[in-house]
């Protein structure tokens, strides 16, 4: 049985946001851009701020140029550390598996903009 959604916009339940952001080598805004972080997050929790997140790290420079890492999982954005699964990849990261740890480094509550650090632990062939 599917339960009716709780009418509570504070959790963003039911919302879907697409992303296409710079993927950088380090946290500071002026860090070297190495690709794009593209995907979506959808409000999936009715009683807390929790998202279903699907994201590709698409590399556009260096030895990883043309390769991707694909991430899928639950993202409770106000938790200090969030762990999500690496479900695959392409190019150098073909058949990738592993996990990422996400940590919010900066957040603007007025705009919803954030800088998030992702540490990737990936096994691939």
UniProtKB/Swiss-Prot annotation:
Glycosylation sites noted in the Swiss-Prot or TrEMBL record: 8, 30, 65
GO cellular component terms attached to this protein's record: apoplast
Superkingdom field: Eukaryota
Disulfide bonds listed in the record: none
Keyword Secreted: yes
Chief location: secreted
UniProt keyword annotations, A-Z: Apoplast, Glycoprotein, Secreted
InterPro entries: Allene_oxi_cyc_Dirigent, Dirigent
Subcellular location: Secreted, Extracellular space, Apoplast
GO biological process: phenylpropanoid biosynthetic process
Function of the molecule: Dirigent proteins impart stereoselectivity on the phenoxy radical-coupling reaction, yielding optically active lignans from two molecules of coniferyl alcohol in the biosynthesis of lignans, flavonolignans, and alkaloids and thus plays a central role in plant secondary metabolism.
Oligomer and partners: Homodimer.
Similarity annotation: Belongs to the plant dirigent protein family.
Name the record gives this protein: Dirigent protein 22
Gene behind the chain: DIR22
